[in-house]
Amino acid sequence: LEFRRVLFRSPPKSTGRELFNLPWLEARLNGEKPEDVQRTLVSFTAETVTDAIRNFAPHIKELRVCGGGAKNPLMISELALLNPDLLVTTTADLGVDPQDVEGLAFAWLAYRFDRRETGNLPSATGASGSRILGCLYPA
C-alpha cells in the first residue's frame, strides 16, 4: 500500500531502497524463478517510467537513461518498445557516462553554491522559491 502512495503521487516524488528492497520483494514472492522475478521488475520499472512520461511529460521527444538501468539492454529495449515516439538512449550518447550523472549533478550544485547562485528548480521540486543550496564548513 505504501508503494502505491509513492507511485501514484504527482511530482515531485522520489523513492528508493527505503521502500523497494529485498525484504519487501521477498515478502511478495511465492517460489517464482529468479529470471521471472527479474523480468517482472524490468517490466514494472519500464511501465512506471512510461506512465510518468505520459502523465507528466507528454511533450518530450527524447529519453536519456542513466544509472544502473542504462547498463541493462532489456530495460533500454523495453523503454523503447513502450515509447515508440521517443528516442530512447543512454546519456553516453551525450558524452556523459551513465554512471557519472549523479556525481556530475553534485559537482554542478557545488559550483552553483560557490558562485552564490540558486541550485533548485521550484517547478520541479515543489519548493516555494529559488534557493542557494548547500553550506560550507571551513576546517
Predicted regions and their residues:
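Short, small-residue-biased leader/transition segments that mark boundaries at the very start
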Residues: 1-7
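Alpha-helical interface subdomain recognition
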Residues: 43, 47, 70-74, 83, ...
